[in-house]
Amino acid sequence: FWTVKVWTNKSKRSSQSKVSSWKTGLMDKQNWKSNWITVNNEDMTSPKIPYFINDFRVDSKIISANLYITSRGVYEAHINGKRIGDAILTPGWTSYSNRIQYQAYDVMEMLLTGENRIGVMLADGWYRNFRQNRKNRIVDYGERTSFISELIISYEDGRKESIIDEKNWSYNYGPILSSSIYNGERVDMNLKNSKWSFPGHKNKNSKKAKIASRYKGFIDYTRNEMIKKREVLSAKELIITPSGDKVIDFGQNLVGWVKF
């Protein structure tokens, strides 16, 4: 806990600030008690995006709940049907062989009394890539994507619980048939399942997840600004080239995606 009071060089002083506090994250990979989670061997090379789920119960009053998560690949995490955070392409691009960044989220308000579900979507990101213009897959950092997460819950009665049960993770596939940093996504909306991360929802064709190899590099908390949606730009001009191709001009350089 900390509080602040300021004195000037003219002996004037401010009022005392309100008491505040901070939380210490997982300082070293040895602090992570959970295992890395991945798909089973037969799905290892599939370009489809797996949707992982883990069900757990909360039966006492909570005073805090924090999710710590990172991945070899990029992830999007959900709890009880709601997306966690607003960052995109987490955990970001680092030299995965040496260092991976993790993120921490306050998820106390997302938890329910009784049954709960945490869900994780996992894509290749910068970690590995399927290049559509070649027959063979090019591996950038590794052949198998995976994630690690730890949900730490503190209860009013003084107990602390870590949701790390790797045996309870399962996965199936959804509408995203492939996802690439360089080649975009292929999506079949006929396969969309908007309730996949709802507690109690039965996902069809679920498979038991597998424990992945441990990460040998350094796991560090995010040091940089996260990638987020900043603004929406309207198209300025539709250009038709001599060959008949249509080019949409937004009037400036940008990094983002197109919505029709």
Segments and roles (model prediction):
Residues 1-3, 8-10, 21-28, 42, ...:
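Accessory beta-strand-rich segments of carbohydrate-active enzymes
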Residues 11-16:
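Short, exposed coil/turn segments at beta-strand boundaries within extracellular/luminal domains
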Residues 22-33, 198-225:
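Predominantly extracellular/luminal regions of secreted and cell-surface proteins
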Residues 35-43:
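Short, solvent-exposed loop/edge segments of extracellular or virion-exposed proteins
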Residues 44-49, 209-250:
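Edge strands and adjacent loops of beta-rich recognition modules
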Residues 61, 114, 241-244, 251-253:
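Tight coil/turn sites that cap or link beta-strands
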Residues 178-203, 207, 212:
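CBM-like, beta-strand-rich accessory domains located in the C-terminal region of large
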